[in-house]
UniProtKB/Swiss-Prot annotation:
One record GO biological process: synaptic vesicle priming
Record's function text: May play a role in intracellular membrane fusion.
Any GO molecular function: syntaxin binding
Name of this chain's protein: Synaptosomal-associated protein 47
Secretion signal, residue range per the UniProt entry: none
Quaternary structure and partners: Forms a complex containing SNAP47, VAMP2 and STX1A. Associates with the BLOC-1 complex. Interacts with BLOC1S6.
Gene Ontology CC annotations of this record: endomembrane system; perinuclear region of cytoplasm; plasma membrane; presynapse; SNARE complex
Cellular localisation: Endomembrane system; Cytoplasm, Perinuclear region
Ranges annotated as biased composition (Polar residues): 342-357
Family indicated by similarity: Belongs to the SVAP1 family.
Organism: Bos taurus (Bovine)
Protein's UniProt keywords contain Membrane: yes
Length: 420
């Protein structure tokens, strides 16, 4: 499960209060917990959920240098020192996941209530996640369609300009005594402002369309220098901001050379250059599993899943598929029971005992909510299919227009060479 996926592991030392000594080992962080394992015996000395933490601090004293302290609800205090690559880097990552867990809906309250979640609620949550994923994909397709429309308008204007060039070349090729040379061409002045305005509107609306924003821990050159910030995924590219909402760097969509997915929570973005250093950022975020599917749609040819990420992704996908199938199977059976099984007067004596021992049926409220989500999914799927078909037709038209423009430009070049 994603909650058991290791986000980061750091070499460090843990202070044993009873024995008054430091123990070397490794501190491991998952999206839901933190644990320390010794180097010699591989024994787990401490392990606790992030939801039990009430305070994370950077402390130091005359005998404990450059440490991170973690205080739990039961007032247990843990000291970690000799942190690599640096104390600030480890502190920033742990604090980020701790804050995101407290702020998220699936934090401590949702975790406590998950044990009593009914099959109907599980199915509703699964369908809601599917709906959100489809909405994100539809939003990307919508902005992509607007960009294709802008390209089509640009090609139309190019054809209009080539027609003007054709008439101008015809005038230059005609004899000086030809009386109709000045009437061969006119510039459609009313077309250009109209196109420029529509293109500007389309560019302002589609190019800067925000798909998703997530908080992240950002490092650029070395892992020891990290800072909190934000990753913004746009239709036109990616933007990285610091904690003061100041833009650190903007990657245009065509400037991104590769995106590597190291874990479900960590990616690196690189823009390569010849003759000067590459621009590369490494980002860790608790919300990264929501971003990666969108990046796979936008940068399908540039994104690379590394071996660990592929293994974890396939495991998570298979487990989710199995869980989804089991929930669907159970829920469909329960919905059939709730819909088709009407209690008869002769069987009411044994019915209460059967209901007490069986799984709880889907409530009427869950059934109505599922129906609404399914109707929205159907509408989104149909709209997405229509948009894809429209974009296929637009791409065919763009291809034909580019071919025509290429032939026309070649013909004009030959005519201009004859004139010179």
């Amino acid at each position: 499960m994603s909650g058991d996926t290791c986000v980061q592991t750091w070499p460090c030392s843990y202070y044993l209060e009873l024995e008054k000594r430091w123990v070397p080992g490794r501190l491991s962080l998952t999206s839901l917990s933190l644990k320390f394992m010794t180097d010699k015996t591989r024994e787990t000395l401490v392990s606790f959920p992030l939801s039990s933490i009430i305070e994370i601090k950077k402390e130091a004293s005359h005998f404990i240098f450059s440490s991170i302290t973690i205080l739990e609800r039961d007032h247990s205090k843990h000291w970690f020192s000799s942190l690599q690559p640096s104390r600030n880097a480890v502190f920033s990552v742990i604090e980020h996941f701790w804050r995101e867990l407290l702020l998220s809906e699936s934090g401590a309250a949702a975790e406590a209530a998950s044990s009593s979640m009914t099959k109907g609620k599980e199915l509703t949550c699964l369908m809601a996640c599917t709906q959100k994923r489809l909405e994100d994909t539809a939003r990307v397709l919508h902005h992509q369609g607007e960009q294709l429309d802008g390209i089509s308008r640009g090609l139309d204007k190019m054809e209009s300009d080539l027609d003007v060039a054709d008439r101008l070349l015809t005038e230059l090729e005609s004899p000086s005594w030809w009386p109709f040379s000045s009437k061969l061409w006119k510039t459609p002045s009313e077309t250009k402002p109209k196109w420029d305005a529509s293109m500007a509107d389309s560019k302002a609306f589609g190019k800067e369309g925000i798909v998703i924003q997530v908080p992240a821990v950002i490092s650029q050159r070395t892992e020891s220098h990290v800072k909190p910030g934000r990753l913004t995924v746009l239709v036109s590219g990616l933007e990285i901001y610091n904690s003061d909402s100041l833009l650190m760097h903007r990657f245009e969509r065509e400037d991104v050379d590769d995106i590597k997915v190291h874990t479900p929570y960590e990616i690196s973005i690189c823009q390569r250059f010849i003759g000067k250093p590459d621009i590369s950022y490494r980002l860790i975020s608790a919300k990264m599993p929501e971003v990666i599917p969108i990046l796979e749609v936008q940068f399908s040819k540039k994104i690379e899943l590394l071996e660990v990420a592929m293994m974890l992704g396939s495991t998570r996908t298979s487990s989710l598929a199995e869980k989804g199938y089991s929930v669907w199977h159970a829920a469909s059976g329960l919905m059939d029971q709730a819909t088709h099984c009407e209690p008869s007067s002769g069987s009411q004596e044994g019915r209460p005992l059967q209901l007490q021992t069986s799984e709880p049926v889907i409530s009427e409220e869950d059934t109505q909510e599922l129906g609404q989500i399914l109707r929205k999914l159907k509408g989104l799927a149909l709209d997405t299919e229509t948009e894809l078909e429209r974009q296929d037709e637009a791409l065919d038209g763009i291809t034909e227009a580019v071919d025509r423009a290429t032939l026309t430009i070649d013909k004009h070049n030959r005519r201009m060479k004859k004139l010179t």
